[in-house]
Amino acid sequence: MWRDSLCAAAGYALGAGTRLRSVLSSRKLQP
């Protein structure tokens, strides 16, 4: 049961990291 929550947390963190990275890259592209 804890493994499911751990996997969900990992997926959420990965998605948040990707979203943050895309926002930073887009912000860096636009002066």
Curated annotation (Swiss-Prot):
The molecular function terms in GO held by this entry are: L-lactate dehydrogenase inhibitor activity
Keywords from UniProt, A to Z, are: Mitochondrion, Pharmaceutical
Q: What does this protein do?
A: Inhibits lactate dehydrogenase (LDH)-mediated conversion of lactate to pyruvate in mitochondria by competing with mitochondrial LDH for binding to NAD(+). Also inhibits cellular lactate utilization.
| Cellular component terms (Gene Ontology) | mitochondrion
Tissue-wise expression: Expressed in brain (at protein level). Expressed at lower levels in glioblastomas than in normal brain tissue (at protein level).
Q: What is the effect of changing S5A?
A: Abolishes interaction with LDHA and LDHB
What's the protein called, per UniProt?
PTEN upstream open reading frame MP31
GO BP term, pick one: negative regulation of oxidative phosphorylation
The gene from which this protein is expressed is MLDHR
What do we know about how this protein assembles, alone or with others?
Interacts with lactate dehydrogenases LDHA and LDHB; interaction with mitochondrial LDH leads to inhibition of lactate dehydrogenase activity, preventing conversion of lactate to pyruvate.
List locations, semicolon-separated.
Mitochondrion
UniProt superkingdom: Eukaryota
